[in-house]
Amino acid sequence: KKRYKSGVFNFEHSKLPRRDLLQNRYFLESIETLRGCPFNCEFCSVTRFHGGKFRFKPLDFIEKEIESLHRKNLFIVDDNLIGAGATSLKRIIELLRLIKDYDLTWMGQASLNIADEDIVLRLAQESGCTFLFLGFESINKRALASFNKNVNLKRGVKSYRNIIDKIHDYGIDVMGSFIIGTDFDTKKSIYELRD
């Protein structure tokens, strides 16, 4: 059988989506400002697809895409808004400053290290962020280790409450992602998760 392969898509060649084709019954729109994740979580397909690379759309293109929106409610569908390292931090700050110029409410998904940077949380709040989806995954250290969830292990499961509280202090809601049913879960640990 033939197998088709292509190179990595260059975001410089992106085209604006045909939002006029969408029906008006949707209450939010979506944009993608980057692709990939610097982490290598065992259960996640993102790194398998993108090879651990973190690629950014040009900010001027994102601005055009924002201006093409028909609604003021937005889901930023990036695999991980914050990423890791100085380049990612600089980029998220630039992105949030751009979004701040528009009257939007938005939600996105990130890793726990988003709570490390007060400037990011402040700009997220000021730019209209109302909701962040965070991958806590487990309160069991052995499960986190088996997931290769080092970003969580570094902070420790006892930090989860502080991370949530800190994000809430900026007026941003948190939805936590948890994986239940690992080899390390017990009936007791599943009930502890509720607390």
What are these regions (language model features)?
Residues 15-175, 180-182:
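Radical SAM [4Fe-4S] cluster-binding motif and immediate context
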Residues 119-121, 184-195:
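Catalytic cores of alpha/beta
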